[in-house]
Amino acid sequence: MAQITVVGGINIDIEGSPFEKLKYHDSNPGRIHLAFGGVGRNIAENAARLGGDVAMVSVIGDDQMGQAARKELEGLGVDVSCVRTLRGRNSAMYLSILDDRRDMELAFCDMDIIEAITPVFLKEHREFIAGSRIIALDGNLTEELLCCAVEMFNGTPIFFDPVSGAKALKAKSCLGGFESIKPNILEAEILTGITIDGEDDVRRAADRLLEKGVKRVFITLNKDGVYYTDGGSEGFLRPVDSLKIVSATGAGDSFSAAILMGTVWGKTVEETARMGMAAASIAMESSCAVNREMNIQELLRRLT
């Protein structure tokens, strides 16, 4: 058993970018980059790099890339005993084609395999998961699975990452079962029905989530930082002006990992939010979804 168990997706991300202007209906010389991704997987990797005792619950196909993704997590110290290989299936994949300015022209996603993480699958690992200090749920999971997890593990704190506005909708019926949640502004609007135009609206949306039963709320505000509250302590944290941003791609997943670590360490909601901001600042200094330089020493240094 691990202190932190992440239930979610493991993806293979493939990105192609041309050396020159993209030519349609033709073969374009360029670079093809392959990386392991998935919200759940990225959260697990970040938490492991921060020194967390982490387990991953997921599914992969019986292809080489899926097995390599599993092996990489294992090499980081993540318990992958609950990552199941499905025979005859492809691992989840995301293929993006960029133009010469590195803007996305086209993308394909083949992620149906995540639907194999079913309530039955969860029940098979019930004892293992229930022994965690906190469980993280990836918003890519099905609505049935989210609600089942809330009911099945009601004695264990659950963290939910909505992932996107459309996917946040799946959690509306079981919001009260989450100990903590990290929506962005759009996701908070969808979950609460409150239009957010300023700080007062952010507070109102967070209060609505607390009313629904969530214990700790972290609403991320893009370049403006984060708002945190647990009903007793609340506040806004802003990014430092000296922040060096290479890419914001991995900021959200690293923030989520820091919330998990803060929970395990018994940190206050403010301390946890500060950990999230520090982790996000590290993540944004890399072009990768997970910064290889993510570590607990650097996070603690940025908290001082």
Predicted regions and their residues:
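A glycine-rich helix N-cap at a beta->alpha junction
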Residues: 75-88
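Conserved beta-alpha-beta core of the PfkB/ribokinase-like small-molecule kinase fold
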Residues: 134-204, 224-226
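Conserved phosphate-binding/catalytic loop of the ribokinase/pfkB sugar-kinase fold
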Residues: 85-86, 96-134
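Short, conserved phosphate/pyrophosphate- and ester-handling motifs at nucleotide-, phospho-/glycolipid
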Residues: 47, 184, 252
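Glycine-rich phosphate/adenosyl-contacting loop at the front of the ribokinase-like
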Residues: 1-78, 244
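Conserved phosphate-binding/catalytic region of the ribokinase-like
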Residues: 1-5, 167-168, 172, 199-304
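Short beta-strand scaffold segments in enzyme catalytic cores
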Residues: 93-97, 225-228
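Alpha-helix C-terminal capping segments
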Residues: 45-53, 98, 262-266
